[in-house]
């Protein structure tokens, strides 16, 4: 509806744009005779719209379309002429009304590319979806850098819960949405309704809980919401950009609660997984690219899945626009600037600094000639990371480490690869450092 689009544009000049994006953009408008039906994904959004925006919505829709009657309903805009199911104004979530708690149905386990870096996280999300509320994985916390698939797995788990039991009420929220809703409820003195909505769902999925850091009242309300859901054996799935105990500003009691269930890290994908992701994403787009092009992207883009997708999208778009075949030469030409920016972001000096900080050393220690174990291992690890994450040759890496010979760098890379197969601590250090480069 054109009138609805104009209504949203006007509202963005009257209310904070982030509020319009969070609470009003999810609504789907449909004209039915002398009324406009606004479809919301869940009762929580309907209640907020009814309390804060409905009066102004009626005024604007009347102005732009001449229709003043506005009906709120749960669901999606129907493709047929059937009438919508009106919202139950008693505040109860009827099991006969389809409930869509902001879940993106595009994300599922079938289109999630599994690799060593995310294998455990995928298995944990699958178990949570199959047995929601089981204490072995409640809460389930997925943590790791940006663009590694945490939200994908969260959506996939929620979608499976709905497939197994269509009446299951799964709500997904970004942490900012939880915070914004709570602030509005405090302002409107409607905290009882705020709490009731969360207590009536079967599963709660919240993204990026590090956003709660330093927000005492938000943590207070989430703490009580967590307890109510946990005691009711309702599944809780959360994501964070790092292990919660490393997040400054989170209350100790909340950190303790988060440790009750299962916490699983998602690490940056290895080369094989990156290549598989590129090929899978290309198939999703109906594009065909040679394996060597997928290998090129996987080799150059190391940090996260979003960077891989960005490179692929750029490549496919230019190929479609120019009509040229996707060859290695075409790919190198198209992605030149993107790859150069990636290399500038992760340079050898940056690697040296991050490794030195991680081990509590100074960069001059890594570059020194001393061969004590406390220095030799971090130095070898830094060299191996430089080989993995940059396009520098072995001699160039050696030069960056105080003029060491290329054979020294080669030995370091082989040694680290060999030791990671048997030394759990070294493998953990490698994974943690790789996560830092994906942040």
From Swiss-Prot:
Q: Read off the InterPro entries from this record.
A: AAA+_ATPase (IPR003593), Chromosome_initiator_DnaA (IPR001957), Chromosome_initiator_DnaA-like (IPR020591), Chromosome_initiator_DnaA_CS (IPR018312), DnaA_C (IPR013159), DnaA_dom (IPR013317), DnaA_N_dom (IPR024633), DnaA_N_sf (IPR038454)
| Subcellular location, principal | cytoplasm
> What Pfam families is this protein classified in?
Bac_DnaA, Bac_DnaA_C, DnaA_N
In this chain, the stretch annotated as Domain III, AAA+ region covers: 102-319
**Does the record bear Repeat in its keywords?**
no
Domain IV, binds dsDNA as annotated region, ranges: 320-439
Region annotation (Domain I, interacts with DnaA modulators) ranges: 1-75
One cellular-component annotation, GO: cytoplasm
Q: Where in the cell is it found?
A: Cytoplasm
Query: What keywords were assigned to this record?
Result: ATP-binding, Cytoplasm, DNA replication, DNA-binding, Lipid-binding, Nucleotide-binding
Q: Where is this region: Domain II?
A: 75-101
What Gene Ontology molecular-function terms does this entry list? ATP binding; ATP hydrolysis activity; DNA replication origin binding; lipid binding
Q: Where does ATP bind?
A: 147, 149-151
Task: Share an example GO biological-process annotation for this protein.
Answer: DNA replication initiation
Q: Which NCBIfam families match?
A: DnaA
Main function: Plays an essential role in the initiation and regulation of chromosomal replication. ATP-DnaA binds to the origin of replication (oriC) to initiate formation of the DNA replication initiation complex once per cell cycle. Binds the DnaA box (a 9 base pair repeat at the origin) and separates the double-stranded (ds)DNA. Forms a right-handed helical filament on oriC DNA; dsDNA binds to the exterior of the filament while single-stranded (ss)DNA is stabiized in the filament's interior.
Report the PANTHER family cross-referenced here.
CHROMOSOMAL REPLICATION INITIATOR PROTEIN DNAA (PTHR30050:SF2)
The annotated subunit structure for this chain is: Oligomerizes as a right-handed, spiral filament on DNA at oriC.
Q: Which family does it belong to?
A: Belongs to the DnaA family.
Can you say what this protein is called? Chromosomal replication initiator protein DnaA
Write down the species: Xylella fastidiosa (strain 9a5c)
Q: What is the lineage of its organism?
A: Bacteria, Pseudomonadati, Pseudomonadota, Gammaproteobacteria, Lysobacterales
């Amino acid at each position: 509806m054109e009138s609805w689009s104009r209504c949203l544009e006007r509202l963005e000049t009257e209310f904070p744009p982030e509020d319009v994006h969070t609470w009003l953009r999810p609504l789907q408008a449909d004209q039915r005779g002398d009324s406009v039906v606004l479809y919301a994904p869940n009762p929580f959004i309907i209640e907020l719209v009814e309390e804060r925006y409905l009066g102004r919505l009626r005024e604007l829709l009347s102005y732009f379309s001449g229709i003043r009657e506005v009906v709120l309903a749960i669901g999606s805009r129907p493709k047929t002429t059937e009438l919508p199911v009106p919202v139950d104004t008693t505040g109860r979530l009827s099991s006969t009304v389809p409930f869509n708690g902001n879940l993106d149905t595009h994300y599922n386990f079938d289109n999630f590319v599994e690799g060593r870096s995310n294998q455990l996280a995928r298995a944990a999300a699958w178990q949570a979806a199959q047995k929601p509320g089981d204490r072995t994985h409640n809460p389930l916390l997925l943590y790791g850098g940006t663009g590694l698939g945490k939200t994908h797995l969260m959506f996939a788990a929620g979608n499976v819960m709905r497939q197994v039991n269509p009446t299951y009420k799964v709500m997904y929220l970004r942490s900012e949405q939880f915070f914004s809703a709570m602030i509005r409820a405090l302002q409107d003195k409607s905290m009882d309704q705020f709490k009731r909505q969360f207590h009536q769902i079967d599963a709660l999925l919240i993204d990026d809980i590090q956003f709660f850091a330093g927000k005492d009242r938000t943590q207070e309300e989430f703490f009580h919401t967590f307890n109510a859901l946990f005691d009711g054996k309702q599944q809780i799935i959360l994501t964070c950009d790092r292990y919660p105990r490393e997040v400054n500003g989170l209350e100790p009691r909340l950190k303790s609660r988060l440790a009750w269930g299962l916490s699983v890290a998602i690490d940056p994908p290895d080369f094989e997984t990156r290549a598989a992701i590129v090929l899978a994403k290309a198939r999703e787009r109906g594009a065909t690219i040679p394996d060597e092009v997928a290998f090129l992207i996987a080799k150059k883009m190391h940090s996260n899945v979003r960077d891989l997708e960005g490179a692929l999208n750029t490549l496919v778009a230019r190929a479609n626009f120019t009509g040229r075949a996707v060859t290695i030469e075409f790919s190198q030409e198209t992605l030149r600037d993107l790859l150069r920016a990636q290399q500038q972001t992760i340079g050898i000096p940056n690697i040296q600094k991050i490794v030195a900080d991680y081990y509590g050393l100074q960069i001059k220690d890594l570059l020194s000639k001393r061969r004590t174990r406390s220095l030799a291992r971090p130095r070898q690890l830094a060299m191996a990371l430089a080989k993995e994450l940059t396009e520098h040759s072995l001699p160039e890496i050696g030069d960056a480490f105080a003029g060491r010979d290329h054979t020294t760098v080669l030995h370091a890379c082989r040694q680290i690869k060999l030791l990671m197969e048997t030394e759990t601590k070294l493998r953990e250090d490698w994974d943690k450092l790789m996560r830092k480069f994906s942040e």
